[in-house]
Regions:
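Glycine-aromatic micro-motifs
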Residues: 1-150
Length: 150
């Protein structure tokens, strides 16, 4: 079976620990999907975007390990693309963006580099999450000021 990773499981060293029998098939781009951050990696449908992914051949044991890691079925749902490739899709509001930790981001960055994936989408997802957090923070400040002055 095949698994498409777009977050921390793009990192070869991390996957070797989680799924020692997983075999990397290489880096690819999934059309019509955009990488986003909601503290951790997620994606959403976007006809103008591509999602960098690493394709892995995995075992049943690896799938169970990934299910546990991804919090399936509560945090992430598991689905198939083209009926063949497993991908985890985070549950909840795709508009609530939030930046990841530096260590988490760096792990993904290393995976992209190892598999020759362009990091433009990774940097754009981080920028979008940081901008969303700033707008949310300013909105909270304005709301607080209104309550104090109102």
């Amino acid at each position: 079976m095949y698994y498409m990773a777009y977050g921390m499981n793009t990192n070869k060293e991390a996957m070797e620990v989680r799924c020692p029998k997983a075999k990397p098939m290489g880096g690819f781009y999934l059309p019509n999907h955009r990488l986003i951050f909601r503290r951790v990696a997620d994606f959403r449908h976007d006809v103008d975007a591509i999602l960098p992914v690493v394709l892995w051949e995995i075992t049943e044991d690896c799938l169970r390990s990934l299910d546990n890691l991804e919090g399936y079925p509560d945090l992430y749902d598991r689905r198939k693309i083209n009926g063949e490739w497993i991908i985890y899709d985070m549950n909840g509001n795709k508009n609530q963006l939030s930046a990841p930790s530096g260590g988490y981001y760096h792990m993904i960055e290393q995976g992209y580099k190892y598999f020759g994936l362009d990091d433009y989408n990774l940097r754009a997802a981080l920028r979008d999450a940081e901008e969303h957090e700033q707008v949310s923070y300013l909105g909270d400040l304005i709301g607080l000021r209104s309550k104090v002055n109102g």
